[in-house]
Swiss-Prot record:
Family the UniProt entry places it in: Belongs to the tRNA pseudouridine synthase TruA family.
Catalyzed reactions per annotation: uridine(38/39/40) in tRNA = pseudouridine(38/39/40) in tRNA
Disulfide bond residue pairs: none
Record protein name field: tRNA pseudouridine synthase A
Superkingdom as given in the UniProt entry: Bacteria
Matches recorded under PANTHER family: PSEUDOURIDYLATE SYNTHASE (PTHR11142), TRNA PSEUDOURIDINE SYNTHASE-LIKE 1 (PTHR11142:SF0)
Subunit composition and interactions: Homodimer.
NCBIfam families according to UniProt: hisT_truA
Role summary: Formation of pseudouridine at positions 38, 39 and 40 in the anticodon stem and loop of transfer RNAs.
Sorted UniProt keywords: Isomerase, tRNA processing
Keyword Isomerase in annotation: yes
One Pfam assignment: PseudoU_synth_1
Length: 270
């Protein structure tokens, strides 16, 4: 077939949300459920051709997202409704497309991103929850959110996060630029809101695990700064559970004009 008859390739970005509790993480793997596999299957049905997607951040097993961003290339010409309503009709109920946007060839969901933002939701009550039990992390001891917030501020800026990095992390460097970290109580819920240019493996959950030790009084506020300086993962607290973690937003240069829907999760304001 001559080049003039070849179908043009278009690049499309999607905003995705999912409840990760029934998935073995984002990344497609053999013989286990993954969000990527379900999304690619649904997109391929709508496009009537194989679709491969690239995401902004690969979430672990049990982790959720309200603001995941993906891109893919296709020769299929479809209306926006096909990439939203049509794809959603082919997805399981715990995965959904939130928006669609045509993007230029130079856009990449991962490499064009300038920052990622996560929220970690703790249900701080003596008794465990039933409703939303897979969407929050239960912690039974009383936590002082203001104390946790003060302790966390030492993490802001460019730092070596070795003390909060999983042993199996494959990143070339432990250095990350943490832009903000806020800890706030909403009734029985505590939300840790954290934004950085990127994250080392388990960074958010390891930070939260140590903050909870401070919040319940087991460690002083100064402990976070000591851990950061020590650059030793074995000194920090255990990794917090996956259930309470949400990827809520990914930042991109303004030139791409990507939608910015409410981050959530649920009723949490931006």
């Amino acid at each position: 077939m001559s080049e003039s008859l070849e179908k043009p390739v278009v690049k499309i970005a999607l905003g995705i949300e999912y409840d990760g509790s029934k998935y073995y993480g984002w990344q497609r793997q053999q013989e286990v459920r993954s969000v990527q596999e379900k999304l690619e299957k649904a997109l391929s049905q709508v496009a009537n051709e194989p679709i491969n997607v690239f995401c902004a951040g690969r979430t672990d097993a049990g982790v959720h997202a309200t603001g995941q961003v993906v891109h893919f290339e296709t020769t299929a010409i479809r209306k926006d409704a096909a990439w939203t309503l049509g794809v959603n009709a082919n997805l399981p109920g715990d995965i959904a497309v939130r928006w669609v946007k045509d993007v230029p060839a130079e856009f990449h969901a991962r490499f064009s991103a300038t920052a990622r933002r996560y929220r970690y939701v703790i249900y701080n009550h003596r008794l465990r929850p039933a409703v939303l039990s897979q969407g929050v992390t239960h912690y039974h001891l009383p936590l002082d959110a203001e104390r946790m917030h003060r302790a966390a501020q030492c993490l802001i800026g460019e730092n070596d996060f070795t003390s909060f990095r999983a042993v199996q992390c494959q990143s070339r460097t432990p250095w990350r630029n943490l832009m903000h970290i806020n800890v706030e109580r909403f009734g029985a819920y505590i939300v840790v809101d954290i934004k950085a240019n990127a994250f080392v493996h388990h960074m958010v959950r390891n930070i939260v695990g140590s903050l909870m030790e401070i919040g319940c009084g087991n460690q002083p506020e100064s402990w976070m700064a000591e851990l950061l300086a020590a650059k030793d993962r074995t000194l920090a607290a255990a990794t917090a559970k996956a259930e309470g973690l949400y990827l809520v937003s990914v930042d991109y240069p303004a030139q791409f004009e990507l939608p910015k829907p409410p981050m959530g999760p649920l009723f949490l304001a931006d």
